[in-house]
Each structure stands twice: as structure tokens, then as C-alpha cells.
């Protein structure tokens, strides 16, 4: 994990060294002050005249002021450089994680929940950022203070300083306990944070459903349960601190009492001066306080390791859909699609049932292919294989005779327009959302695409027309309006293959008929796949695939299937009854 994350410090080690140097300067200056104060006591006691006392006090005071200013300078340098290093470290790490996640396939995203990925990119990276800052400041300051204080203590009384060695076994035990119990606790705590984020995310996204079903109290209970779990896990982690702190404080107080007792005996014997006892005690307290800081710091490092492991897990995830070594770049794509004995299941590592079984058909360039079938029969799974959102587990999906797995991914998806089952719009203006399909589209092209998708009229009715902001992904639009904007976004690409996954379900039949008419008029060379619940949506298709339980049960035109396919006839009859009733 450390090796993986250390690359994000590349080019920052110089600043890190400056930060460490500044902290060491601050530590030395801070610990030199008691010695200067002790020199004042000594000079006052041995001074021959009031004038010499005044001179000694002024000179020592100026020396202490100079040390304080030098220490302040070192501290400011450390604060600035450590903040700079930690911010740049987090910026690089977060950027790398985002780029990695943006290349995830649907299967990769399925491995992590959306809430977990959000937590890892925000909370976990921020924790690592704080750990880096802590390492540059506290992790340097604490050992520096402890070592310098020990040197000063030894210079005053080596024999009394030796007693500090008995603290080492106790410190080792404390550190071992922290490493053994702290890391698992923080691992669990980060998972609890994932859960809290998941509940909040689901609640905010589904707020309309929550209010429509009057389930606010239920969602509050869910949040409180998740929050209570996090608080309970946090309390366990805090319990470790509560256990460690009293032990360290008891050790500190016992040693300080012993120092004053032993120092009094040494002063009585003439070995130490009275002023040296207080100075020696201050150094011992510094050493012990820094040992306590080390124990607290290890708790943060344990949490940092838990977060680091979670971040590295994302960075090390093998992306299962990538470009081949020598990707195929089509020069003049036609849009012909062929499925050859294709089978597919989502869980390729398990033994689950296939979602699709032995699918074979051919769609010629420019044909309109309708796909009908019951809920859960695999319609969406089938079309998801064309742009390689998933890969087939068996067989081949070919475009213009070339396996899609041989295509350059960008080139493949550039020639395909997709309107997914779930309408997704982004924050921004209507114009910006349409340009998602073609980033250099002109205003005229945007208007033409919206006219073809029957969206132009309602867009003009918006307060600012095409410059109207879509709040929270289009919550200020109806379902049918969002569908038409998504269709326009796909149409503006003028793709060779257009996939409409139940994309007119919220559109009235008259508007849907106009959209279909625009396909026939403007997309004669585009191969169109239409998944629909209404037979009327695919009735004029060149081919209709009838899916049932992951298998093709019929292929043909509307008339052919109506004549010899029982499943299709049942669908038509059922819908006809619904209309007549």
C-alpha cells in the first residue's frame, strides 16, 4: 500500500524535506529555551553586582527572544510546506481515482456500491491527506522533540536520564495493542461511513418517492440505524484511546514525582543545582508527552492504513473491458450488427443462470430492429453488449463483420448512440446536455436534433429556452420531456447504430409516432434497435426479435410473427384488449 501511494509524492520530497527541517528547527528552539532560563538563574546566583545581573538578564532574554522568533519561522515554514504537500498529494490521488473509476465497466462498478466509491474518493482521500500532513508535522516534531529533550536531559544528569529506558517496554506494549486492535476497528468504521452515505444518497435521489408514499419516518429510522452503527463503531475506536491515555498519564505523573524526589536528593548531596531540577523535569515531561503523542498518532496511522487499503483496492481493480493491443479503427463504418451464438451472465465467476442463451441474428445496415418480450427476459442485457458495456461470456458480437472486442473502445462507442432505460440528464443547461452527444455541435444542430425528437416546442416554452438550467438532473422536467431530450442527445451524433432502450415509454403515442417518423426520414443509414413494451412502437420494424427467458423465440416482421408466433400473438392480443377496455 505504501509503495502504491508513495508515487503520488513524486516531486514533493524536496518540500517535505523543507517541512521536516523547519519542524526540527522549531523543536530545537523550543527545547533550548529552558536551558537559557536556567542560565539566568545561575548568573543571578553568582553575579557580583546588580549591574551584572541586569546585563545577564537582558542578554539571556534577547537570546530567548531570538530563539522564539527562529522557532516561529521554522513553524510557519513547516505549516505552509506540509499543507502544500498534502494538498497536492490528495489532488493527484483523487484525480487518479476518478480517472480509474471513469474507465470502469459496468461490471467493475457493480463490485463497489456508488456510495462506497464516493466515500473512498472523498472521506478516505481526505483522511490520507491529513495523515500526510500529520507525518510531515507531528511525526517529525514528536521524535525531534523527544530526541533533543533526551540529549538536554542527559547533559544535565546522565544517571537520572537512564531511568527513561524502563519506559521502552511499556511503550512497545502500547504500540502493539494499538496496531492489533486499532486497524480492524477503523476498517469497520470506514464501512459504516459507506453505509451512512448510501442511505443519504438513496434518500435524496428518491425523495419524491419517499414523500409520495409518506415514508419519511421509515427513512429517518434507516438513517438513524446507520448513524447509530457508525457512532457505536466510533465509540469502540474512541474506547481504545480512553484505555491508552490513562496508562500513559499514570506513567507520566509517576515519573515526574520520581524526578522531583530523586532531584531533591541529588541537590541535597550537592550533585545538582535546584534550578537544574526544574529544567530536567521539563525535559522529562517533554519526552513523556511526545511518547503519548506517538501513541495517539499511531491511532491516526491505523485509520490511514484502513483508508489507504480501500483506496488502493480501487486503484488495483483490474478493468475487465479495455482496448485490445492493436485496436481496430473503422474507416467507413456501415452499422451492420451480428450476434453469433451469444450467451451472457452477469456473474461470470459464479454458477448463476445465463441471462441470454445462444442468441443469433443479423441486422443489416439501416434496418430497424424491434425487441419485445416480458420483463426480465434480457432485452436490455442484449443491447448492452453492442457498445461493450458488458462482454459476452460466450459467442461473438460483430459490427460490420468485426468482433466488438477488437474495436478501439472510443471509436466503437462514438459510432453508437444510446438512450438507456433510465433517463440521465446532468446539471447544466438544456443546450449543454444535448452537446453531450456531440461536443462541437452548433446551435442549429441542437435545434434540429430537438425537433426530430419532438422536444423543440417544450424547450422553447421553458423560461430561458435552450439556456434553461436543469436542476438536479432534470427534476424540473416530466418523464416524457426527459426522454425526448435523451433521444435528441443520441440523435445529434448521427450514429451508425442507435439503441433506444424503452426510451419512449413516458411519451404519448402521437408524439412517439412523430419520433419514429423522424427515424425513417433522417436516419435511413442508421441501424436502429428499439426495445419497447408497446407493439405499436416496433410494428413497422424490418425485424422484430421476440425474447423469452433469455432466448429468441421468434424473428420476423410484424405480419410474419402475428401469423406463426404464439408469444408475439399473445402480446398483441393482450395489448389490444387493454386498449379496447
Residues of each region from the PLM?
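A short amphipathic helical element positioned immediately N-terminal to and/or at the very start
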Residues: 1-12, 117
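ABC-type nucleotide-binding domain
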Residues: 53, 330-581
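Hydrophobic alpha-helical transmembrane segments of ABC transporter permease domains
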Residues: 10, 21, 25, 29-33, ...
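An intracellular "coupling" helix at the cytosolic face of ABC transporter transmembrane type-1 domains
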Residues: 11, 103-107, 123-136, 140, ...
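Helix-loop-helix
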Residues: 47, 152-166, 175, 180, ...
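Transmembrane helix-loop-helix hairpins at lipid-water interfaces of multipass membrane proteins
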Residues: 13-77, 81, 154-159, 261, ...
